[in-house]
Amino acid sequence: MSLLQFSGLFVVWLLCTLFIATLTWFEFRRVRFNFNVFFSLLFLLTFFFGFPLTSVLVFRFDVGVAPPEILLQALLSAGCFYAVYYVTYKTRLRKRTTDVPRRPLFTMNRVETNLTWVILMGIALVSVGIFFMHNGFLLFRLNSYSQIFSSEVSGVALKRFFYFFIPAMLVVYFLRQDSKAWLFFLVSTVAFGLLTYMIVGGTRANIIIAFAIFLFIGIIRGWISLWMLAAAGVLGIVGMFWLALKRYGMNVSGDEAFYTFLYLTRDTFSPWENLALLLQNYDNIDFQGLAPIVRDFYVFIPSWLWPGRPSMVLNSANYFTWEVLNNHSGLAISPTLIGSLVVMGGALFIPLGAIVVGLIIKWFDWLYELGNRETNRYKAAILHSFCFGAIFNMIVLAREGLDSFVSRVVFFIVVFGACLMIAKLLYWLFESAGLIHKRTKSSLRTQVEG
């Protein structure tokens, strides 16, 4: 890449970054937080944060990258995607009407809400316990990170339930919403994330997500400033780099450490070059249609229920890894959101995907606002826990693609909804057995006086 080519790319990168950052800033000033703000920051991180890192790798360490015209296509496709997404998100689908009282879809009380978070936490802890009994601490047993996907590790399906510890702790926080509950959320979820990091053998997702949710709650409540958020972001990048070194068993120093920091940080937070690699091989892609979305559900079907289930699932990430990169190391390489759309239907699917994503984020913001307006604090805690708990799925959406997002968000909704139903069933059984006694003002006054 020549200096002139880099200058052209830099101008395009700067314009796209300023465009998205400006719209995000105006939205932040208007509402302080919603899921449009979160997705916009996530989109910036995924598709634009990596460009400066790539530039340093090219000019400082002479690392080979895709041709400049392909990198330009990647930047422009990301910028155009966001423009279509933003217009879709801001488009009003129906006329604004005065709030008419409607019959609520469901209600929650204190016992049902507490039962819900206990069940969610129980699912996570039991899953971790069973996985640990089968495999022990994989971080200290395996020689390479790719081995966690091998036949040496049993009970891999249990890892999908670990994440429900975070929604459980979110319910606990939203029931109190004070600084002590906020700090308790951070300590409990990060501690759980570190435990799963050691047990699973290097998975950092629970730690990243817990820390991100903690920061956004702090921003919403005004407990941290933007400068503190930026400092925490830098600390998070350094922390993730250190965990990555431990995961891959690397011991580096000097220039090698700087080089390793650049490419690991780029691959962890901003795999935008993967989109460029897909575009570089555009003519060789056999468009998969909507099949990757259907195939991604295969991993949630037990083999005893479907004996002939394919052992290898050809979703967009695996198609990119196996067919485009010809990489059979055992790791699936993230194609990014736009990359997954390219795999499914080429350039035509990019604006269509942007419209779909705009509607998805719009739905989450509608649900979030519903929680903000809810007068029943227990129902509000459940709604907010569901919305913030889905942040993991939005990260999957930006990094892994639309197919991975759809299967995971459906799984999340099913498990979360099942926990709600079980909590309500248990409450009904306890109440029928006479074990539930409603609190009265007189009993509360007696407790206080006593």
From Swiss-Prot:
Chief localisation class: membrane
The job of this chain, per UniProt, is described as: Probably involved in the polymerization of enterobacterial common antigen (ECA) trisaccharide repeat units.
Intracellular or extracellular location(s): Cell inner membrane
What superkingdom does the record give? Answer: Bacteria
- Binding partners and assembly: Probably part of a complex composed of WzxE, WzyE and WzzE.
- State the InterPro entries in the record: WzyE (IPR010691)
What Pfam families has UniProt attached to this entry? Answer: WzyE
User: Gene Ontology terms, cellular component aspect?
Assistant: plasma membrane
Q: Which UniProt keywords apply?
A: Cell inner membrane, Cell membrane, Membrane, Transmembrane, Transmembrane helix
Protein name as it appears in the record:
Probable ECA polymerase
Family of this protein: Belongs to the WzyE family.
Tell me the GO BP annotations in alphabetical order: enterobacterial common antigen biosynthetic process
Q: Where, by residue number, does the polypeptide cross the bilayer? A: 6-26, 37-57, 63-83, 118-138, 155-175, 181-201, 207-227, 228-248, 341-361, 378-398, 410-430
Query: How does the record say this protein sits in the membrane?
Result: Multi-pass membrane protein
Q: Does the keyword ATP-binding apply?
A: no
Q: In which pathway does it act?
A: Bacterial outer membrane biogenesis; enterobacterial common antigen biosynthesis
